[in-house]
Amino acid sequence: AKCIGCRACTAACPTGAAAVAAGGRIQVDRAACRSCFACVRACCSGALSRIGEELDARTLVERVMAQHMSWRAEGGVTLSGGEPLAQPDFAAELLQRFREEGVGTALETCGYVPFEAFQKAAPFCQLIFFDLKCMASEVHRRYTGVDNRRILDNLMALSREFPDLPLQVRTPLIPGVNDGREQLSEIVQFLRRLPSLADYELLPYHNWGEGKYRQLGRSYPLAGLEPP
């Protein structure tokens, strides 16, 4: 509704990702977009805007701590994502600063990062939520695009190197993908070898991410799959 049809965004886009579609509507080709935000800077009407902002760890902690008095007594901070350990130095600094403030800390991870990332962040965590989708590497590759060897190695190494750090392992149950009795039994057998396993949680499938795929112009690979 804010677009005035000036087409400044299409002129500013270096890759041609922003283009005029049928009916004169501006459409962004997500595959061609480099997220340079030249179109946003050129938009004088505010029809295009950037979501999010870059902050250093100190500023972010200050903003969070400004709300600290409204937390419940058991409140704390959990780093989630995306994958927070994709920025291991930033994640470690955030966690350390929160611990220095006396705030409880936790971290959610898919585990597909260099183990050095865990070594940086784990000393400042009080709990880690670790996703383990399946044990079969071919199934994991088919549905996520990557092998799970690194994930399994990281989970075992993390539990052994930080035996006092509780691990809560979680498996999102996808009907027809990883919800078979044999598949779950393989996971349980592996988890029994972890020194610091605190809990194992099965998460029922949901399709809350379908709208995000639509906004990104991508097809949802599990379209038609109904939650239990």
Where do the PLM segments sit?
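Short, intrinsically disordered, charge-balanced linker/junction segments flanking boundaries
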Residues: 1, 193, 225-228
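Iron-sulfur cluster-binding cysteine motifs and their immediate structural context
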Residues: 8-28, 38-53
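FAD-binding FR-type
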Residues: 24, 32, 53-59, 63
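Pocket-edge positions in alpha/beta enzyme catalytic cores
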Residues: 25, 49-52, 83, 143, ...
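Conserved AdoMet/S-adenosylmethionine-binding subsite of the radical SAM
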Residues: 58-208, 214-215
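Short glycine/proline- and charge-enriched loop/turn segments
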Residues: 214-223
